[in-house]
UniProtKB/Swiss-Prot annotation:
Catalyses which reaction(s): ATP + H2O + cellular proteinSide 1 = ADP + phosphate + cellular proteinSide 2
Organism of derivation: Pseudomonas paraeruginosa (strain DSM 24068 / PA7)
Protein name stated in the entry: Protein translocase subunit SecA
Gene from which this protein is expressed: secA
List of residues binding Zn(2+): C900, C902, C911, H912
Subunit structure comment from the entry: Monomer and homodimer. Part of the essential Sec protein translocation apparatus which comprises SecA, SecYEG and auxiliary proteins SecDF-YajC and YidC.
Ranges annotated as biased composition (Basic residues): 906-916
Amino acid sequence: MFAPLLKKLFGSKNERDVKRMAKAVQAINALEPQMVALSDEQLKAKTAEFQQRYAKGETLDQLLPEAFAVVREAGKRVMGMRHFDVQLIGGMTLHDGKIAEMRTGEGKTLVGTLPVYLNALSGKGVHVVTVNDYLARRDANWMRPLYEFLGLSVGVVTPFQPPEDKRAAYAADITYGTNNEFGFDYLRDNMAFSLDDKFQRELNFAVVDEVDSILIDEARTPLIISGQAEDSSELYIKINKLIPRLKRQVEEVEGKPSEEGHYSIDEKTRQVELNEQGHQFIEDLLSQNGLLGEGESLYSAHNLSLLTHVYAALRAHTLFHRNVEYIVQGDQILLIDEHTGRTMPGRRLSEGLHQAIEAKEGLPIQAESQTLASTTFQNYFRLYNKLAGMTGTADTEAFEFRQIYGLDVVVIPTHRPIARKDFNDLVYLTQEEKYAAIITDIKQCQALGRPILVGTASIESSEYVSKLLQQAGIEHKVLNAKYHEKEAEIIAQAGAPGSVTIATNMAGRGTDILLGGNWEVEVAALENPTEEQIAQIKAEWQKRHQQVIEAGGLHVIASERHESRRIDNQLRGRAGRQGDPGSSRFYLSLEDNLMRIFASDRVKNFMKALGMQSGEAIEHRMVTNAIEKAQRKVEGRNFDIRKQLLEFDDVANEQRKVIYHMRNTLLSAEDVGETIKEFREETLNATINQHIPPQSLPEQWDVEGLEAALYSDFAVRLPIQQWLDEDDKLYEETLRSKILEQIVAAYYEKEELAGAEALRAFEKQMLLRVLDDLWKDHLSTMDHLRHGIHLRGYAQKNPKQEYKRESFTLFQELLDSIKRDTIRVLSHVQVRREDPAEEEARLRREAEELAKRMQFQHAEAPSMEQAVAGEDEELPEGPAPVVPLEPVRNEQKIGRNEPCPCGSGKKYKHCHGQLD
């Protein structure tokens, strides 16, 4: 009630933040005459002075006004660019560990130099994170002269970089790279066999460019390093042939599903589900083709992997379309980033989905993979001591940034007022009418000499618009995932008078469209251009630039609304940069995906009430509001998916931290002898407790079993029964001590034979190997657990709580297994003298061989809607298409003929007992 009044009196939080920083800007401006008076050498010397002052106890906040003034002056001298006051505010926002929302063309790259320089003074390193390798290299090369003038080193990390180059890049004061490469290097570091093989230092400060794209759009999908698993390509091919025989269950007019069909598709959640008829039909087909035993159920425990293959193939055929979600290049499937329209070479979908698409397209099927290490961007970026980001559009996602990352969004004022006109959406009944209107708009703008940018949501749409323009005889350029090697050339001239550029999702392109075209690209195309040629090109560009401004600037046409308002705003933001004129218009139809799935009924009824005819459009704020409401619905759903992914990964993340800490401790330890000693005693006590329970009577002891277990775990044959027969004074505790003495003595014999130094090195390497192997298996088990955990909802249990409980049990078992397996390997190994350095070199060679076979995936996010179905939503009918882990039983086993605890009334063997 009082919020509007308080806001009027005191301003919004954003206004107060900007006002507070404006005072600091005055202090920086006051230092400018002092900096101008310094010679180049004196200005360079400021860096060493700041570093000394920091070492003596001054904080970075105290150094900020002078440091920013130094960077501003260096920018003028080295690059001919002076930071505006609003850019100083942006720099302070980033230094404070916040997100700066700055409009397109406001110079985000230059803004980044301010906090990057300041934080690099600490000597702990700064990471500048971009969305692709091209931008990482471009920005690093662009800003390198400025940083090097000030005495700071700059490095760039890229995929397939030689290890020594990558190590040098991370050792630099400032390191540029992509979010994927930083994330994968973190995972690779935690698979290293030596401290010398690690790349990254402490994760100190990261500035994330296009922060919304990296921390939100890509947060649904985990980073995975995987190795090859068993080959099942024949199975994919056989099942692929059966899927086209299944029919989709369509909805009738009333919204109820018809009885015809085998499966239904939920387009909102991108899930596909076999119905009862479909289950029976596919089981019959599998039986006829010899893939399923006669009378067997697809849901029997030993057939669950077959079920996974069926659902993977079904999703490949129904949810993934060529030239929309992926393209075929040679004999490979290249995924398309839905947010940027770029292809993602090297990325593969998980859970057999990529192989299913390869089978669908008749391509060679690459072997499935097994997860070796994984994390999410959410958990990786939260490892940094301080995180900041910048983007043109963050305010719509401010709540998520705050809740997930603890980052506030500050909207930075523009240097010049925005002069762009954003027209209301035009909504047509059909796509055909919509595209006809788009062509008409293009012709009108071209006649005026205005450049036009047409934004589409898929390659298919971009190629359709291109076809229509060809038929209309309009010259144009196409920028989509198929042709992005020509990207820079196309973008450079997208602002030329009358030019028409079709772009698939301009988000994340990272290049401004300059009105009149880009004269620097024209100069670069010449061989050894003279001063006269450069001056002539500049003059011609100035004439074109003025011509485009007078015509009304760049006109942005969008062929449909994206799921996210933010992506729409990014497309709009391509026009009207730095106060230039421009305009934008969205053309929609009731047949568009977003309208059809989320907003069609209400808008359709409204349009019918108006008595709209074919070819007519509606332009009304109510329609635009209805569409934005639909977008907010989608954004909310996507936020829930990301939040649920994080909640599940948080459980794994705590375990990941423990394992990685254990691993780093081992790597930095010169001697793990004490650790091995502890493992030996704990393993021995566990083995003895299993056969001689604490405080038990001798009659309860399983001596024969203990003798066998000791040989299995410690490779020693001990006559325990003989000891007990010969010595009446032996009881539980003294027996433990005697067994330990014998085991230690046997191990010391091994040490004398191999040499203490060699055995210590071997212990360390073997412990690392056991830890890695078991962690890899644990990740696979956790995957299966997560994918099947929603089934617990049938038994009225909370899937999230069940996941936490069972994953904790699994982790305890993992820690016990690491101890037991390490001792077992060390006890059984036959030792011979070998140089520790040779052993380490051999292990490193093996690790390099493994690295060659690794795959780096930013895999499709596993769906989490079903995982929380037990909490908020109605459970789906029938089990989901995933492989559940067999539950760890802490409760009493249920008899097969007893009633099922889920409350269905069926016998357990006919209900959930089929999964046991």
